[in-house]
From Swiss-Prot:
Gene that this sequence comes from: Jrk
Protein name, entry field: Jerky protein
Regions recorded as binding DNA: 38-58, 110-142
SUPFAM superfamilies in the record: Homeodomain-like
Organism from which the protein derives: Mus musculus (Mouse)
Domain HTH CENPB-type as annotated: residue spans: 77-149
Subcellular location as annotated: Nucleus
Alphabetically ordered keywords of this record: DNA-binding, Nucleus
Residue intervals of the HTH psq-type domain: 11-62
Cellular compartments per GO CC: cytoplasm; nucleus; ribonucleoprotein complex
Tissue: Brain; highest in the temporal and brainstem regions.
Length: 557
């Protein structure tokens, strides 16, 4: 009887109200995904079934806060996700804070309070609000900001936060059943596409060009396997460059912006009108269901809109915390380096480059370099963030090494030695680093023409052989002019598709590469040869270029 009364009494007692921290709530969500018993979780955390259902319903908000939080300590202290009274002001202020942090500008507590007051006046709000120290503390706790001062705003790489974000990302991918085909990353890079390296000596012997400062910003995006590469988006200053007139198809997308940079409007338009349709088309191509989900991984930038704005049905975005971007952003793990390596080594003649190279050529070069990055580069770039995923090996390691490795040409030491042992000319006054810079840039040429020292000088070719060489060279020049005219003509005809134009431009690239194998690519070598002939007429230079002037008295001394 007594036991029944005790049981009835215990049953009638109300359970003490327990408010879990955000970290505990995220742990519950993770354990529910693993299939752990709800009853066991209720007993461990001393909560009811309705509480578990509420936590599960707010899982997306919890994970979003976790991803954007700068400090894991905020998860251990904060217990609710209540919104502030002035929600719009809070959102605008936090967005401003993220912009300044991404720019590397320190933001202190007083600065944040003054900016909040400024936004309050600009929005013409009437609801009373006191921007005090308590308000600042609540703002920091609400957004997971650990500390505010001039010394702590510069974000250093946080390895512990990187490990935690990797765990969050893996759980997110497992929850939605995502494969590497469904996970994308995007990032921007700037290109000063008309600028040349300063490799020639500044002694007045070489005609100088005014260095071009024409800049493009390129937005690159691809999935984790590298099998689907979104058409790059180039942003320039001009709305309709003269080089685009009459061209029906561009190999990449192009937008104009005053500073040649990505802004929120351009990025949002790219997301909804280029990225999302391209992803869905790719899913149809590989046989995935139309309702398959896709994730776009971004870093915090003033150019990117909020996560809530970058959503389209089954396609959504997540942001890397600022403190782990340098450690986990796939673009920083070799993709950007491989792209830039391919971009700065195009099969374009060095002579006449600044004046003949226009923005259309640069865009074609961007498309060529982006498509030439080996798929294995993309796959390896995700190893830090997603180490548990397995990829189907695509390109060989040799292909990746050829693309990414920056090594001096194998004949660099030999060439440099001959230059410095030769007659007194510009080559003897060059620094090793400047010569190596151009040798590395011309590394795609199989064998560089040897510069022969006076002791190795050879006799010039006979007049008949020279005439034959000049005739053959003229034929190559005529073919090059005709080929370029054909490409320009096809660009202005609507009957050619983008794929057909790409094939024609690829063939044009092969032709130009073969043409360059017949002549020195590096302008420095031409300068050395010309000066050697001018200062020492008895020296002849052995080269594959048949039209180089040469003294008929060479070797008669």
């Amino acid at each position: 009887m007594a036991s029944k009364q005790a049981a009835a009494k215990g049953k009638g007692e109300k359970r003490k109200r327990v408010v879990l921290t955000l970290k505990e709530k995220i742990d519950i969500c993770t354990r529910l995904e693993r299939g752990e018993s709800r009853k066991a979780l209720m007993q461990e955390y001393n909560v009811g079934m309705s509480t578990l259902y509420d936590i599960k319903a707010h899982k997306a908000q919890l994970l979003r806060f976790f991803a954007s939080s700068d400090s894991r300590q905020a998860l251990e202290q904060r217990r609710t996700l209540h919104t502030p009274k002035l929600e719009h002001l809070d959102r605008v202020l936090y967005e401003w804070f993220l912009v300044k942090r991404a720019e590397g500008i320190p933001v202190s507590g007083p600065m944040l309070i003054e900016k909040a007051k400024d936004f309050y006046k600009q929005m013409r709000l009437t609801e009373p609000c006191v921007f005090s120290g308590g308000w600042l503390w609540r703002f920091k706790a609400r957004h997971g900001i650990k500390k505010l001062d001039a010394s702590s705003e510069k974000q250093a790489a946080d390895h512990q936060a990187a490990e935690q974000f990797c765990g969050f990302f893996r759980s997110l991918a497992a929850e939605h059943g995502l494969s590497p085909e469904q996970v994308y990353s995007a990032d921007e890079t700037g290109l000063v596409w008309r600028c040349l390296p300063n490799s020639a000596p500044d002694d007045g012997t070489v005609p100088h060009f005014k260095q071009g400062k024409d800049r493009l910003t390129v937005l690159m995006c691809a999935n984790a396997t590298g099998s689907h590469r979104i058409k790059p988006l180039a942003i320039g200053k001009g709305g309709g460059p003269r080089a685009f007139r009459g061209i029906q198809h561009l190999p990449i997308a192009y937008k104009a912006q005053g500073n040649a940079w990505v802004d929120k409007e351009i990025f949002s338009d790219w997301f909804h009108h280029i990225f999302v349709p391209s992803v869905r088309e790719h899913f149809r191509t590989i046989g995935l269901p139309e309702d398959s989900k896709a994730i776009l991984l971004l870093d915090h930038s003033r150019a990117h809109s909020q996560e809530s704005e970058l959503v389209s049905e089954n396609v959504f975005t997540i942001f890397l915390p600022s403190s782990v971007t340098s450690l986990l952003q796939p673009t920083e793990q070799g993709i950007r380096r491989a792209f830039m390596r391919l971009f700065i080594n195009p099969p374009v003649a060095f002579q006449g480059f600044p004046t003949r190279h226009n923005i259309n050529d640069a865009i074609v070069n961007v498309a060529r370099a982006w498509n030439a990055v080996p798929s294995q580069v993309f796959q390896r770039a995700w190893r830090k963030l997603w180490p548990t995923v397995t990829f189907t090996e695509g390109s060989s390691s040799e292909e990746e090494a050829e693309c990414c490795a920056i090594k001096p040409h194998k004949t660099f030491a030999h060439i440099l030695g001959l230059v410095k042992e030769g007659p007194t000319c510009s080559g003897s006054r060059l620094q090793d680093s400047r010569v190596e810079e151009r040798v590395v840039a011309g590394r795609d040429i199989d064998e560089a023409p040897a510069i022969v020292a006076p002791s190795q000088a050879t006799r010039c070719t006979k007049k008949s052989e020279k005439d034959t060489g000049e005739t053959e060279e003229a034929a190559w020049e005529q073919a090059a002019t005709s080929f370029e005219a054909l490409v320009r003509f096809a660009e202005r005809q609507p009957c050619f598709s983008v794929q057909e134009m790409g094939q024609l431009q690829a063939l044009h690239t092969v032709f130009r590469r073969q043409q360059q194998l017949r002549q020195p690519r590096v302008a420095l070598r031409a300068v050395i040869k010309l000066e050697a002939l001018q200062e020492h007429p008895g020296v002849c230079v052995a080269t594959t270029h048949p039209t180089l002037p040469c003294s008929s008295t060479a070797g008669d001394n």
